Amino acid sequence: MKRKNFAHRPGCAVEATLDLIDGKWKGVILFHLQSGTQRFGELRRRMPGITQRMLTKQLRALEDDGLIVRKVYAEVPPRVEYCLSDIGESLRPVIDTLKAWGERHQQRLSCAPVSAVIEAPAVGVP
């Protein structure tokens, strides 16, 4: 993926960083990988709103940018695992800060806290 050149621009470090984690899913993927190495299916289950195609695309972009490491095992069936790279790991405080900010401003952001989502009964289930 070709990256923009942000050198010699005011705010370039912020713009370049946001460009790396832009979009709806990259930050969420990085958040989930903070808990350790995961396979594609595990990530997909943690993010029910993402399509298989989009998850594949986002994982490739994060790998191309050096934020995650993809490890393929020579097994049948094939096994592929993803984990944070050292540079991806260095984003941990950034992702944690975004999470904390989101938790403080949930009502304003119109999103339910995780506990409410987990505890909410399914529609039509007694």
Regions from the language model: what does each represent?
Residues 2, 8-54, 74-75, 81, ...:
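N-terminal helix-turn-helix DNA-binding core of bacterial DNA-binding proteins
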Residues 1-9, 64, 69, 83-126:
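C-terminal regulatory/oligomerization modules of transcriptional regulators
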Residues 58:
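Residues within the DNA-recognition helix of helix-turn-helix
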